[in-house]
């Protein structure tokens, strides 16, 4: 009985991942991805120099871009 209980506890921990996974937006239309350990969510602005317009990129990263329109964060779905 103890073995069964221990097995269930281990399976639960593995399946739940103890909350260490970070979920970020990775596209404009709201698709998400689970980031590798140690990474953050980012939304950063990129200038299309030939048009003068800005557009955004969403992704997981270990190094965030700096800038006034950029978001770098470490909670689920924080890079909207």
From Swiss-Prot:
Tissue: Expressed by the venom gland.
Chief location bin: secreted
GO MF terms held by the record: acetylcholine receptor inhibitor activity; ion channel regulator activity; toxin activity
Subcellular location(s) of the protein: Secreted
UniProt superkingdom: Eukaryota
Keyword RNA-binding: no
Homology family: Belongs to the three-finger toxin family. Short-chain subfamily.
Name recorded for this polypeptide: Three-finger toxin MALT0059C
Organism of provenance: Micrurus altirostris (Uruguayan coral snake)
